[in-house]
């Protein structure tokens, strides 16, 4: 009788340990920034607009490094990107905080499934009644006929955020999300 109880106890402990490991692995996999992370109107995966760079790095389980041009003053405008993977994600930083997320990776999608390569009609169908189309400032003339397809949210809580899809020849070439006014800066920090 005593062996049976200790066998049950061992089985229970092993079962509990396995469940715990599965849960921990699942939670940590969800928290890490990857190509499977979804772009939202206010961030991507675990990174949110308004986070400090160190906070975003810890939240996403990655190291963010400074990239490209921008002012050397940390309270002005500059970009950071993941060191290593995932590629094709850049975070604009203004006043020491993440202000927008720029996507050039074809594998990354929005929460609704929009991605690079989608045609304009698909974007319109994913966000019915929420897209404002304007001419692209650089490629609006034929043959490119480029546009900015800007998601203007219906929810009052999101009124200061946008997702902007840049198109050329009827296809999304890149997209970004973030807060106003930074999300609308045509040339990033330039």
Regions found by a protein language model. Give the residues of each.
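The feature marks the first
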Residues: 34-38, 42-56
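Post-signal/leader-peptide non-cytosolic segments of secretory proteins
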Residues: 41, 96, 101-103
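N-terminal secretory signal peptides that target proteins for export/translocation
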Residues: 1-7
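Bacterial N-terminal signal peptides
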Residues: 13-24
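Second-shell loop/turn segments in exported
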Residues: 40-46, 107-114
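Short, solvent-exposed mixed-charge patches
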Residues: 188-190
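A cross-family detector of function-defining hotspots
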Residues: 31, 51-94, 115, 120-186
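Sec/Tat signal peptide C-region and signal peptidase I cleavage site
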Residues: 25-30
């Amino acid at each position: 009788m005593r062996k049976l109880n200790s066998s049950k106890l061992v089985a229970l402990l092993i079962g509990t340990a396995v469940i715990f490991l599965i849960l921990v692995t699942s939670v940590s996999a969800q928290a890490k920034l990857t190509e499977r992370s979804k772009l939202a109107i206010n961030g991507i995966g675990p990174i949110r607009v308004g986070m400090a760079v160190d906070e975003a790095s810890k939240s996403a389980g990655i190291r963010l490094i400074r990239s490209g041009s921008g002012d050397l003053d940390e309270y002005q405008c500059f970009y950071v990107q993941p060191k290593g993977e995932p590629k094709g994600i850049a975070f604009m930083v203004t006043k020491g905080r993440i202000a927008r997320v720029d996507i050039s990776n074809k594998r990354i999608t929005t929460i609704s499934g929009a991605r690079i390569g989608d045609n304009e009609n698909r974007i319109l169908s994913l966000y019915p009644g929420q897209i404002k189309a304007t001419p692209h400032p650089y490629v609006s003339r034929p043959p490119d006929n480029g546009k900015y397809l800007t998601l203007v949210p219906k929810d009052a809580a999101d009124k200061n955020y946008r997702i902007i899809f840049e198109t050329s020849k009827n296809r999304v070439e890149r997209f970004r999300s973030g807060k106003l006014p930074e999300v609308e800066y045509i040339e990033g920090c330039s």
